[in-house]
Regions:
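Short, linear, compositionally biased motifs with a strong N-terminal bias
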Residues: 11-14
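C-terminal motif of bacterial Sec signal peptides marking the signal peptidase cleavage site
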Residues: 16-19
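Bacterial N-terminal signal peptides that target proteins for export
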Residues: 1-9
Length: 227
C-alpha cells in the first residue's frame, strides 16, 4: 500500500507516493509533467481554450533539501545534476530523471534551474493553439533562452525513511503561463503563427516571464491528508 501526500499551489502540484522498497534502496524517483487543469480549490480560476502540441523544458539541476537545512550546505543537498530535456506533455525526460539515492530525513524544499539545452539554445519551448470565447483561434510558439529558477518551500514536509522509495510527481499548470496575455494584440508571422520570443512579440514574452516568476517562487496554499 502506498501513502499519498499532495502539496499544491495554484500552478504547481507535488504528489508523493511512498512505498517500501524490496531492497535496501532509500531515495526519490522523480518525474515532471504539464497539466491543464486546476486543483479543486481553484476551479473558479480556470483558464480555458488551450490545446498544447509541445511543452519542453531544459533542466540542468534539481535540488531537494532537508527541512533542518539552515545554511547553503552542500552536504545537506540531494540533487539531480546534468542536462535534461523534459517533455511536459508526456511526463518524460531525456535522459530519464528516475531514481536518486537520498539520506533518510525530513524534506520540504525544492529548487530547479533551467538550462539552454533545447534546439536553438532555448530553455523553454511551448507551442499550441488558443481559442478565445468568440471562437477565434491563435496558433502560438513561445520560447526563451533565459534561465529560470523554480523554488518551492512547504510547511508540510515529507519524511523519507530508511528502505523507502518515494515517487515524486511535479505537475506544472501550463495555461497559467498565459494568464493575462491578449493574443489579439500579438503580431503573427507569414504562416499565421504568433511567435513569442526574446526578439518577436517581446512585450508578451515579458508578461509570460512575469507569470513564470510568480509560479517559480511559491509557498504551498493547501495540503491534503494522507490517503
Amino acid at each position: 500500500m502506498k501513502n499519498i501526500l499532495k502539496i499544491w499551489t495554484a500552478a504547481l502540484i507535488f504528489i508523493f507516493a511512498a512505498s517500501c522498497s524490496k531492497n535496501s534502496d532509500t531515495g526519490i524517483s522523480l518525474s515532471l509533467k504539464g497539466t491543464t487543469t486546476f486543483p479543486a480549490f481553484k476551479k473558479g480560476a480556470t483558464i480555458e481554450g488551450f490545446t498544447f502540441s509541445e511543452a519542453l523544458l531544459g533542466i540542468k539541476e534539481i535540488e531537494i533539501k532537508k527541512e533542518d537545512e539552515m545554511m547553503d550546505d552542500g552536504d545537506m543537498d540531494f540533487d539531480y545534476d546534468g542536462s535534461y530535456i523534459v517533455d511536459l506533455l508526456l511526463g518524460k525526460s531525456t535522459p530519464a530523471l528516475g531514481f536518486s539515492e537520498f539520506l533518510p530525513g525530513t524534506y520540504n524544499k525544492f529548487e530547479s534551474k533551467t538550462a539552454s539545452v533545447l534546439d536553438g539554445g532555448k530553455s523553454l519551448s511551448v507551442k499550441g493553439i488558443y481559442t478565445d470565447a468568440a471562437g477565434t483561434a491563435y496558433s502560438f510558439d513561445v520560447s526563451t533562452t533565459s534561465k529560470i529558477k523554480f523554488e518551492f518551500e512547504s510547511d508540510t514536509a515529507f519524511v523519507l525513511t530508511e528502505g523507502t522509495v518515494l515517487d515524486m510527481l511535479i505537475n506544472l499548470n501550463l495555461p497559467m503561463l498565459f494568464e493575462g496575455v491578449d493574443f489579439s494584440k500579438a503580431t503573427a508571422n507569414g504562416s499565421g503563427i504568433i511567435v513569442i520570443n526574446d526578439l518577436t512579440n517581446s512585450a508578451i514574452l515579458t508578461k509570460i516571464m512575469s507569470n513564470i516568476d510568480q509560479i517559480a517562487n511559491m509557498e504551498d496554499e493547501h495540503e491534503s491528508e494522507h490517503d
